Regions:
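Short linear regulatory motifs enriched in tryptophan with gly/pro/ser
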Residues: 1-189
């Protein structure tokens, strides 16, 4: 693939707030992506299913999809906002996903560096833990879910286990699988 259009990359650390132990990802992302594309990248990196509304906040700006209604602020079109123009080194963005559950992410720009053609321009470099299941009730609901799953005597244990499935492991994070999905996403970018 020819990545001449990628002059620099952003080194990001993205942390899901109010969840303990922390769920986080460290990514290398082309500085040329829009916030709309970064939304898709974060959905893949965290394992969200893109079933809910989202928005970005930085300074006085609130950005999101043009057809989306914000919660009080006028939204700028995220598809016109390029990461490299919105967020430089040491900048912090706020990424909110699923306003009902209230999943808040902090996106820290750790560095902006020249693109090294020997590395993929888009990759998850590290991370920890599985993302909470969609519609699990936000941080408080997720904590309740984890407590019920951990205690076989909890009256909701069986219902919660049936809901999330036997394969759900809150400690699991498969970096190689996420990178396969990101590579596929980047090919179609």
């Amino acid at each position: 693939m020819n990545d001449v259009r990628v002059p620099t990359v952003h080194d990001l650390r993205v942390t899901l707030l109010d969840v303990s132990p922390p769920v986080w990802r460290r990514l290398r992302v082309p500085s040329t992506v829009t916030l709309s594309a970064l939304h898709g990248i974060l959905q893949v990196a965290f394992g969200w299913r893109d079933c809910h509304l989202h928005e970005w906040r930085t300074g006085e700006r609130t950005l999101g999809p043009p057809e989306e209604e914000s919660w009080g602020d006028e939204l700028e079109d995220e598809s016109a906002a390029v990461l490299g123009e919105v967020a430089g080194a040491d900048c912090v963005l706020h990424y909110d996903y699923d306003f009902g559950d209230g999943w808040e992410h902090i996106v820290e720009v750790l560095a902006v560096t020249p693109y090294d053609a020997s590395q993929p321009p888009l990759a998850v470099l590290d991370g920890a833990r599985a993302v909470p299941p969609e519609d699990s009730g936000g941080p408080i609901g997720y904590e309740h879910l984890l407590d019920a799953l951990a205690d076989e005597d909890d009256p909701e244990h069986d219902d919660m286990l049936e809901w999330v499935g036997d394969a759900f492991d809150p400690e699991e994070f498969d970096r190689a699988e996420v990178n396969r999905r990101l590579e596929s996403l980047w090919r179609w970018h």
